[in-house]
Amino acid sequence: MRVSEVFDGLSCFSLRTLSLALRRPSELRRYISQCLRKYDELVGNGLPCRGPVTPAENLTITIPAYHAGGGMSFDELVILARVTKTLKPRTVFEVGSYNGLTTAVFELNSDPDARIVTLDLPPGTGAGQALIPGDKELVASRHVASVPRALGLSRCTQLLCDSMAFDPSPYLNSVDLGLIDGAHDVAHVQNDTLKMARMMSDHGIVFWHDYGGKGEFKPLASYLESLAKRCPLYRIPDTSLAWAPSRELKAAIWEMRN
């Protein structure tokens, strides 16, 4: 455990924290992480809060009832569904399929002719050395695209490879809605962000998941906050979602690489 994690834990100390540590120690890390994320949000640390869209009053969304844990919360799925329904993307690209829950949300809430593309490691692939411990557990427990199959959905294109080796060339300037939720170490997040920026159209939105975490997720937050110095980048209240408008993100990435 890092010294910074110890200080984070001490900053959340209370009798209830101690009680949880004694009664359900396996839940302590998640509890402290949620407390710290909410504190940062309330006092204005990190990215500013802002919603990505304002849906029309007559819009409805569809969310799968099944949720096996891990990945997105129901609140986060609702946000992605609202954005999909409002933005009406022609192409959606997701890095990090996991069980396909968010893939299903994109397919259920997009137009019938929209293209849904999702990328993940091939089944049976071992977790690489770069992955943080939490990612290694998810890689070991995942069942790629199991949710879309259970729902009878078949419109998505499943790509199977490490995102570090992925060639974005076939999708350049064509993606209207992007989600980065693959490996959460800085090397992968930076790689996925650069490639996503190349694939995005000028009128889209890019999301990142697991922003605001501490411990092993802190480098991800630091990377996004450094990127926010070059382009508008926001957090969504009560979630771990961050987002940026694609035009500004593309311009910032181009400036950084030239």
Outline where the language-model segments fall.
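Conserved adenine-nucleotide phosphate-binding loops and their immediately adjacent elements
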Residues: A56-Y66
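Generic secondary-structure transition motif, activating predominantly at the C-termini of alpha-helices
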Residues: S11-S14, L22, S26, L36-V43, ...
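Membrane-proximal basic amphipathic "stem/tether" segments
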Residues: M1-N58, W254, N258
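S-adenosylmethionine/decaboxylated-SAM
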Residues: P64-G71, L77-N258
